[in-house]
Amino acid sequence: MTTAARPTFEPARGGRGKGEGDLSALSKQYSSRDLPGHTKIKYRQPTQDAPEEVRARDFRRELEERERAAVKGRDRGAREHTTSSSSSSSSSSSKRPRLDQIPAANLDADDPLTDDEDDSGSDSDSDDDTAALLAELEKIKRERAEEQERKEREQKAEEERIRMENILSGNPLLNLAGQQQQQQQQQQQTQTKNTFSVKRRWDDDVVFKNCAKGVDESRKEKRFVNDTLRSEFHKKFMEKYVK
């Protein structure tokens, strides 16, 4: 008789299976992301601006040294550029034969003489353009200075006017015009108080007045109805949008 259909209870119990004699030695599965990653404290390195290093450093001296190095690099680049340009111009001039060195037999009437003349013409044109630009720049600076001076004069004149007005208004012996204006205002107020005429509105004599109101809302009785279909709002809404 086969025993394959018998219930196997022993393998179903944890720690009692094959090779698992201890209940505490259960199988466990770990992931690499579950393991501790940072197991050591990271300290600040010597070149990472520690507080002691920052206190000991002389920032002004470092800044001055960097500025001197930058100026030296700029000057060296400018000198190299000028030397290269002068060498290139000398080489080009040495390569180009001068007009007096060319024999008359090689000169042709159709050949344009555009070597030195073009260079001198381009130099003169560039000088003229530079002079025109400088003149325009000076003109713009002068106009801006004049505009700034004009604004300052206007501001000073306005401040002086306000100061004189404050002085005159604060002194009752000098503020005669202000006293006259106050007296005139008081007289007008007394005249308006003495007159019993009611001022009319500017739209009292119009023909069509309050045409859109219809029935006076104040005369209607205010009532509350606990029904949405018979409420005043619903009636107004239906009259306005449905009819």
UniProtKB/Swiss-Prot annotation:
Pfam families the UniProt entry points to: Cwf_Cwc_15 (PF04889)
GO function terms (MF aspect): RNA binding
InterPro entries linked to this entry: Cwf_Cwc_15
Biased composition (Basic and acidic residues): 52-82, 136-159
Region annotated Disordered, chain positions: 1-159, 176-196
Highest taxon above the source species: Eukaryota
Primary location recorded for the protein, binned into one broad class: nucleus
Coiled coil: 127-169
Low complexity bias spans: 84-94, 179-192
Quaternary context: Identified in the spliceosome C complex. Component of the minor spliceosome, which splices U12-type introns.
Protein name as it appears in the record: Protein CWC15 homolog
